Regions:
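Intrinsically disordered, low-complexity regulatory regions
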Residues: 1-177
Length: 177
C-alpha cells in the first residue's frame, strides 16, 4: 500500500525525493519547484505548471533562492544569519546542497524541464536572470500542453524519442526539428 503522507509516489519518482530540494528553499521557491517537479506525475500538468508560474510571477528573486540558516552562517564565522545582496550570493554564501540537486535535475532533464532547473540553478548562484529562464520554461510547457499536439509530438518537442509518424505530423504542420 502506498504511503501518500510520508512518501507520495509522485515525489519519489525522480532522481531524489522532492522534499530533499524544497526544504532548502523559502516558501515561494519551494512551491515553484514542487509544482514543476511533480507536474507530470499527478495527472494535472497544466494546473501544476500554472501554480508554479504564479509563484515565479509573485516572488522576489531572493524568495526563489535557497535559504541559508544559522548553521550555514556559522560556517562563515557569523553569529547570526547574514543578509547578502543577490549579486554577492554567488560568492558569499556556502552551498547548502541546492545547486547540486538542481544540476542533477537539469542534467537528467527531469520532467522535460531542463531550462527551468537551469534557471533555478542560476538564481541559486545569485544571477537574477535565472528567473526569466525559469518563467519562460514553465510558460512554454503550458502552451505546448494546451496545444493540440499528440503525446508523441510533445515527446519530440521535449527532446524525447517518439514514433516516426509523430515527426512526420510535426513537419506537416511546419515544425522543423
Amino acid at each position: 500500500m502506498a504511503d501518500n503522507v510520508n512518501h507520495p509516489a509522485h515525489y519519489e519518482a525522480g532522481p531524489f525525493e522532492c522534499v530533499e530540494l524544497t526544504r532548502l528553499y523559502p516558501f515561494m521557491g519551494g512551491n515553484a519547484i514542487k509544482y514543476v517537479y511533480r507536474h507530470r506525475l499527478k495527472g494535472r500538468e497544466v494546473e501544476d505548471l500554472r501554480k508554479a508560474l504564479w509563484y515565479l510571477d509573485h516572488a522576489e528573486p531572493d524568495e526563489l533562492r535557497p535559504s541559508y540558516t544559522r548553521r550555514d552562517a556559522r560556517a562563515l564565522g557569523a553569529a547570526t544569519p547574514l543578509t547578502v545582496p543577490s549579486m554577492e550570493a554567488n560568492l558569499a554564501l556556502p552551498d547548502n546542497g541546492a545547486t547540486h540537486l538542481l544540476r542533477v535535475l537539469e542534467r537528467a532533464d527531469w520532467q522535460g524541464m531542463a531550462p527551468f532547473w537551469k534557471g533555478m540553478w542560476e538564481l541559486a548562484r545569485g544571477r537574477d536572470s535565472g528567473l526569466t529562464r525559469a518563467k519562460r520554461a514553465v510558460a512554454r510547457r503550458i502552451s505546448l500542453l494546451e496545444s493540440d499536439y499528440s503525446d508523441d509530438e510533445l515527446r519530440l518537442l521535449d527532446g524525447w524519442s517518439a514514433p516516426p509518424a509523430a515527426m512526420w505530423r510535426l513537419r506537416a504542420r511546419g515544425m522543423e526539428l
